[in-house]
């Protein structure tokens, strides 16, 4: 009788659920107050004019207007502002 010994079990095969991070509204897009602009870990993007920052570093619009991305300062930081 032909038999094959059972294979061993593995301890791998798990992965965490994706967090859906990233830019949600791009430069020039119109936004309403409260719209999420970026979901991020840490401050990859900094809050500029008319942009608020949540406790998980989410950037959101404080007023209606258009999204503007800019690089400022000696450390070339990326700022996101809303132009009304």
Swiss-Prot record:
Q: What is an example of a GO molecular function annotated in this UniProt entry? A: structural constituent of ribosome
Q: Name one Pfam family in it.
A: Ribosomal_L27
The cellular component terms of Gene Ontology attached to this UniProt record, alphabetical and capped at eight, are:
cytosolic large ribosomal subunit
Indicate yes or no for the key word Cytoplasm. no
Keyword check for Ribonucleoprotein: yes
* Annotated Gene3D superfamilies: 2.40.50.100
Q: Name one GO biological process term.
A: translation
| Region Disordered, residue ranges | 1-22
Assigned keywords, A-Z: Ribonucleoprotein, Ribosomal protein
Q: Which PROSITE patterns match?
A: RIBOSOMAL_L27
In the record, the note on similarity to other proteins reads:
Belongs to the bacterial ribosomal protein bL27 family.
PANTHER family tied to this protein: LARGE RIBOSOMAL SUBUNIT PROTEIN BL27M, RIBOSOMAL PROTEIN L27
Q: What is this protein called?
A: Large ribosomal subunit protein bL27
- Organism per entry: Shewanella loihica (strain ATCC BAA-1088 / PV-4)
């Amino acid at each position: 009788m032909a038999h094959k010994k059972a294979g061993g079990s593995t301890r791998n095969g798990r992965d965490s659920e994706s967090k859906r991070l990233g830019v949600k509204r791009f430069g020039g897009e119109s936004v309403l107050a409260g719209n999420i602009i970026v979901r991020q870990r840490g401050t990859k993007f900094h809050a500029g004019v008319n942009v608020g920052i949540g406790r998980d570093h989410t950037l959101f619009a404080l007023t209606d207007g258009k999204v503007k991305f800019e690089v400022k300062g000696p450390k070339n930081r990326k700022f996101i502002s809303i132009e009304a």
